[in-house]
Amino acid sequence: MASEMSKNVKVTDDQEVTSQERDQSGGTKVGGEEEIAPLARQSSILSLTLEELQNSLCEPGRNFGSMNMDEFVANIWNAEEFQATTGGCKGAMEEAKVVDSGSGSGDAGGSGLCRQGSFSLPLPLCQKTVEEVWTEINQAPAHTSAPASALQPHAGSGGVAANDRQVTLGEMTLEDFLVKAGVVRGSFTGQAAMGSGMVNGPVNPMQQGQGGPMMFPVGPVNAMYPVMGDGMGYPGGYNGMAIVPPPPPAQGAMVVVSPGSSDGMSAMTHADMMNCIGNGMMIENGTRKRPHREDGCAEKTVERRQRRMIKNRESAARSRARKQAYTVELEAELNYLKQENARLKEAEKTVLLTKKQMLVEKMMEQSKEKMNANRGGSQLRRSGSCMW
């Protein structure tokens, strides 16, 4: 019975891919996928539904609806760290390699097995509960998310979601909930793998860093922020993802090591590339580089530098003017002192000449008086003792 259900799920999946993929997945290879594919899907926490996570993580009597988004994300990452430390990530990566060597479609489950990088919640979303976020998602216009949901199946559901009924909170996968809530830009697991399968067919995870297409987010994709097309024939945008071929790696450059690989030399998965790009990083020749600053920041820096140069020039001009004024003032004072000194010297000469003349005149008067005195003592006096 379980084998028949798995075959029905596989037939539904084959209806969404090209005829070439349908031919490659036929024959004796279907039996291997019936046993491996469900394990690869369930190995990623993002492909589990909220009801399954609630039954495995929450305490009895408590559900995700009463938690705020901070507690909800913290519980998710704690569970994922526990899964990574127990070796689940490594085992699932080996399963994905077996599927790829057998059927050529193993990247559908292997792209999300490695632990995803953590992200920061927007400030308005931190204090809201899960129920409030779900209510806002349902209140958003239906036409914004209809094209994206019609183009792709829900991750981990095993088929295309029915469009005639409303999906409940418990039936939604963790990945879809985070995307629709606006916490992350794009999908972590299924969407990147589907993009590579629809354009260039199945891609081996070992070759994704060399020749496989890379998925880049072109805008926020959720129920509240729609994407207005991506130039590939999809009116609503293929979940906000643009598929572009990556540049070939340089000779001698090491490929980025995947944290979940068994041999330590496998190529970086699509999910890791998405996390690096979403966190503002660029991947070039196997290394991570920060993006260049925007032109606006460079223009502001140049304007600030020019204003500083103008201020420095004005300050230097004011300093030179002050020094020149001080020098002119000192020169004027020196000239005044020189003129005053010359005037005082002339006055001193005049006073000395006046004193000298007065002294000469006084000496002449004294000499005259002395001469007069000498003249008066030598004259004969008339005698009155005898008569003539």
Swiss-Prot record:
The keyword Metal-binding does not apply. CDD domains: bZIP_plant_BZIP46 (cd14707). Pfam families: bZIP_1. Keywords: Abscisic acid signaling pathway, DNA-binding, Nucleus, Phosphoprotein, Stress response, Transcription, Transcription regulation. Residues 302-365 form the bZIP domain. PROSITE patterns: BZIP, BZIP_BASIC. Residues 304-323 are annotated as: Basic motif. GO terms for biological process: abscisic acid-activated signaling pathway; pollen maturation; positive regulation of DNA-templated transcription; regulation of DNA-templated transcription; response to abscisic acid; response to cold; response to salt stress; response to water deprivation. One of its GO terms (molecular function) is protein homodimerization activity. The modification Phosphoserine is found at S44. GO terms for cellular component: nucleus. Residues 330-344 are annotated as: Leucine-zipper. Expressed in roots, leaves and panicles. Expressed in seeds. It comes from the Eukaryota. Forms homodimers. Interacts with VP1. Interacts with GF14D. Interacts with PP2C51. Interacts with SAPK2. Belongs to the bZIP family. ABI5 subfamily. Plants silencing ABI5 exhibit low fertility rate due to abnormal development of mature pollen. Plants silencing ABI5 display increased tolerance to salt stress. This is bZIP transcription factor ABI5 homolog.
